[in-house]
Amino acid sequence: MPQIGLVSAVNLRVQGSSAYLWSSRSSSLGTESRDGCLQRNSLCFAGSESMGHKLKIRTPHATTRRLVKDLGPLKVVCIDYPRPELDNTVNYLEAAFLSSTFRASPRPTKPLEIVIAGAGLGGLSTAKYLADAGHKPILLEARDVLGGKVAAWKDDDGDWYETGLHIFFGAYPNIQNLFGELGINDRLQWKEHSMIFAMPSKPGEFSRFDFSEALPAPLNGILAILKNNEMLTWPEKVKFAIGLLPAMLGGQSYVEAQDGISVKDWMRKQGVPDRVTDEVFIAMSKALNFINPDELSMQCILIALNRFLQEKHGSKMAFLDGNPPERLCMPIVEHIESKGGQVRLNSRIKKIELNEDGSVKSFILSDGSAIEGDAFVFAAPVDIFKLLLPEDWKEIPYFQKLEKLVGVPVINVHIWFDRKLKNTYDHLLFSRSSLLSVYADMSVTCKEYYNPNQSMLELVFAPAEEWISRSDSEIIDATMKELATLFPDEISADQSKAKILKYHVVKTPRSVYKTVPGCEPCRPLQRSPIEGFYLAGDYTKQKYLASMEGAVLSGKLCAQAIVQDYELLVGRSQKKLSEASVV
């Protein structure tokens, strides 16, 4: 049964048996306050322009921008799909049980004050579940925006630009539980169960892998591969299937053993033709870790395939219905604060101050203030942690292993065009270009970004190592050349067709850790050898690697370790107080 907001017949395309009709300013996004900030359960930042640094770059064509937004409430049609049945899968139930242990744990007689550095998904998750267990997290974020790798900013036109193109899979059980626990399942816009790849040899054309709703996993995935005859030949499919047999039969132990070999080398070792790697796994490698298959560890691919093929809805994708800081991070913040926790922006860690015994005394902020607590968590990226690693810890093997973990550069590009592009889908698209990874027309896929007259393409530019230091204009020029192949009838590199109204280029020199062969043994457990000090983040040890799901799970595991260490941490605090009173 369709859910109806303000409805018109704009671009109505039926893509499935269930259609969701919505308005970009209907109740699904909240009501509009006097200051223009949409409000629903107070989940918005007022004056969101202050959430990040402006990267706005005008072009001569920008004078026609914002026409639609000035016409009043938009009447919008969006074809989304119902939330899939995820709640009874083994992984979802396992994640739900872990969440329940925090709510069910005995209320502490003395709640711990835990200082957490970094308000990305790892830090937010750690704080959320510690608050659920009755403790008082103090979450410190260096910047003026929440989200870490899912941060976003609003420009002077009211348009958002993001750190990355974020996709929520059915195979993300801890993320899906988190949305349910916060009561925001309706903020995920589920798309058709397909994977859509551009065809470089046929400019402007796409090839699809469509997953049947009638079949269980892994049959729906196998059928999707067998039905696609445009990317792989039958002999290639057979050789690929034979090559995958050891992974399918060997289970998790086999998957973990493939950490030391690259995707390309593994494929050749298994007798899989190079064309399979070129046709499928270049795109998949770039989407998973922003690097090519000659660098990526095969373990990463096998983990993804395992999740996608073992769960019926594992590879089904959803977009968040708006910007991540307001639509995802703020509900977590409000949950934390409702239980007595704190979240502080503009609180950059300058130094980890130690006690004489080598344990953490406080986090020193850039303004000179010291934040003390009963326990400390560093949930910022591994590259930042290594810069702040105390000298006394550098010879400890646990910390020495972190040298192998290095963030990978990535660039996120947003381009607003003067017209609606036709050669696109309401979905994530794999570009299969040499410079671009995945992209989406966010004016179609996302409620908050909807525009019936003008497209906004958000594109992941990867691998980005050779481009991260180049100018924004060079990156845009290179992107337009790639788009001319994807949209041959609508885009040309010289803008003689669709014209750029404006663009934003967001560079992240060190994003998720680069999952090259040999990284797995270097990933740290959340509980460090330093009593009272813990790590969280997608680079820490958890089974979902470098992803939003991995970050959320790392936070839960970190919170679990702290709850388990409650007696030890209380004892440390009492000893500290008694020593202070003697002095």
Swiss-Prot record:
GO terms for molecular function: phytoene dehydrogenase activity. Its EC number is 1.3.5.5. Homotetramer. It holds the Pfam family Amino_oxidase. This is 15-cis-phytoene desaturase, chloroplastic/chromoplastic. Belongs to the carotenoid/retinoid oxidoreductase family. It is found in: Plastid, Chloroplast; Plastid, Chromoplast; Membrane.
